[in-house]
């Protein structure tokens, strides 16, 4: 006799998030969305400021104005302070995000982590490959291979806010995890490939400072007046070591504890991230964009973006490489692990998110400055290519996401519906008997109201009476 068929138990990928994870993602992305809009405003301001002849000189003067203690090796230009100083705050938050993902988020479970990690890695490797092939074919410089590898989550969310599209929580979490892993490998790329000379004395001091930072955290020492001065010292030593100073930010972020203990509502990492994220998204990143995105744009310059191998490689890497890398790896990973896409989503949704990830701005601009540090003209051309590629990726994503917007709106409404008004969306209470008892009580009251109205209408019809007050499902002017 044939053995009974085993039911299909294929693992679902990109399914609905747990309620705590959904709440965390929503809170994190809400701040990033506001920051993304500010980033967009700062970018437009920089482009206008740098391209109006009457204002162009003032932009250059402000960007190259130097200040800071020369004796400590910190007499830097405003643009330099923004790139090395303010972005350390951005990478500090990125470090906390990564730590949280590793100990309490999607990356905690190796099976769940495979998909976003593979997608992020391929989403960096394929753009780098596209850039390299373009420049080998066109006899250009391969120094900028890392420029199109990054995803800017804030800019991507700003695009979503502008076009009025709400992604389901699973897609938002996927995009956030992609960006977090992207940031991690971008940091490694900066540390490994863009560190030329190392001052080992300063590096040793920075490492010692990080050790003190870690020890104070483990001892439970509290107080910003302890950690902020120490963080500034570590940053200054890291800067003078020759290693990019933003590495100090991510290192300190990774040291924070992101798990809760008994009696704690939030972990120290979550608490500090909640305090610092608005500073990062609302001030640090927009100011970096203001002094980094101000490239002179002309018809000839835009034409060069599509003719010079270095700039064309950046554009193709962001628009084509990112999309193919993320979508292709996600599809192949699901196929070879015998996983199935959540029934709420389609592969077209993954393709749309992959194209949205082609918006590589903040980190791409930073790597562009590092890769072509000795060539001001090429640096500006690469910045223009980053802006152009990100704009094309945003337009492609807008079209793809708008096609699916009605479906997304329905999924978001399902995730937020709370008919029993207990503060928890109904989709998270389907297995809770108390929820069904509350819903049964609601429906019984609605049914009783319907019966009352029907009976009064019938009585009114027999006696030729007036209209019956009230409405089905209403009690005292409120839904039953």
Swiss-Prot record:
Keywords: Antiport, Cell membrane, Ion transport, Membrane, Sodium, Sodium transport, Transmembrane, Transmembrane helix, Transport. The keyword Cell membrane applies. It is a multi-pass membrane protein. Signal peptide: none annotated. Its main location: membrane. It is found in: Cell membrane. It holds the Pfam family Na_H_antiport_1. One of its GO terms (cellular component) is plasma membrane. InterPro entries: Na/H_antiporter_dom_sf, NhaA. Residues 454-480 are annotated as: Disordered. GO terms for molecular function: sodium:proton antiporter activity. GO terms for biological process: regulation of pH. It catalyses: Na(+)(in) + 2 H(+)(out) = Na(+)(out) + 2 H(+)(in). PANTHER family: NA(+)_H(+) ANTIPORTER NHAA (PTHR30341:SF0), SODIUM ION/PROTON ANTIPORTER NHAA-RELATED (PTHR30341). Na(+)/H(+) antiporter that extrudes sodium in exchange for external protons. Belongs to the NhaA Na(+)/H(+) (TC 2.A.33) antiporter family. This is Na(+)/H(+) antiporter NhaA. The lineage of its organism: Bacteria, Bacillati, Actinomycetota, Actinomycetes, Kitasatosporales.
């Amino acid at each position: 006799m044939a053995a009974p068929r085993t039911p299909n138990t294929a693992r679902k990928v990109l399914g609905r998030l747990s309620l705590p994870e959904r709440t965390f993602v929503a809170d994190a992305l809400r701040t990033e969305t506001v920051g993304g809009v500010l980033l967009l405003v700062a970018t437009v301001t920089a482009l206008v400021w740098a391209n109006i002849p009457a204002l162009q000189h003032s932009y250059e003067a402000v960007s190259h104005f130097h200040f800071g203690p020369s004796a400590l090796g910190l007499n830097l230009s405003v643009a330099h302070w923004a790139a090395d100083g303010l972005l350390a705050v951005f990478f500090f938050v990125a470090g906390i995000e990564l730590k949280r993902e590793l100990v309490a988020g999607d990356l905690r479970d190796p099976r769940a982590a495979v998909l976003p990690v593979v997608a992020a890695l391929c989403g960096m490797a394929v753009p780098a490959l596209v850039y390299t092939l373009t420049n080998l074919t066109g006899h250009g410089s391969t120094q900028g291979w890392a420029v199109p590898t990054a995803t800017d989550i804030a800019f991507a969310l700003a695009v979503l806010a502008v076009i009025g599209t709400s992604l389901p929580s699973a897609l938002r979490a996927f995009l956030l995890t992609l960006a977090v892993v992207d940031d991690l490998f971008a940091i490694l790329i900066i540390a490994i490939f863009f560190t030329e000379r190392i001052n080992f004395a300063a590096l040793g001091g920075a490492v010692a400072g990080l050790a003190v930072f870690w020890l104070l955290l483990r001892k439970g020492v509290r107080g910003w007046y302890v950690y902020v001065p120490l963080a500034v010292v570590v940053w200054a030593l890291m800067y003078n070591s020759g290693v990019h100073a933003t590495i100090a930010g991510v290192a300190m972020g990774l040291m924070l504890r992101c798990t809760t203990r008994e009696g704690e509502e939030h972990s120290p990492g979550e608490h500090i991230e909640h305090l610092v994220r608005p500073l990062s998204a609302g001030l640090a990143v927009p100011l970096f964009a203001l002094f980094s995105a101000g490239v002179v744009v002309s018809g000839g310059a835009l034409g060069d973006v599509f003719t010079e191998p270095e700039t064309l490689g950046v554009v193709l890497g962001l628009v084509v490489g990112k999309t193919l890398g993320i979508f292709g790896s996600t599809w192949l990973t699901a196929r070879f692990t015998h996983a199935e896409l959540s029934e709420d989503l389609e592969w077209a949704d993954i393709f749309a998110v992959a194209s949205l990830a082609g918006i590589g701005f903040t980190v791409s601009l930073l790597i562009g400055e590092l890769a072509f540090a000795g060539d001001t003209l090429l640096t500006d051309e690469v910045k223009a290519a980053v802006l152009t590629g990100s704009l094309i990726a945003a337009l492609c994503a807008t079209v793809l996401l708008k096609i699916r917007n009605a479906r997304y709106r329905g999924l978001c409404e399902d995730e937020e519906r709370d008919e029993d008004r207990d503060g928890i969306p109904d989709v998270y209470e389907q297995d809770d008997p108390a929820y069904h008892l509350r819903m049964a009580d609601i429906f019984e009251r609605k049914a009783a109201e319907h019966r009352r109205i029907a009976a009064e209408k019938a009585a009114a019809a027999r006696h030729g009476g007036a209209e019956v007050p009230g409405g089905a499902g209403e009690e005292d002017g409120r839904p039953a």
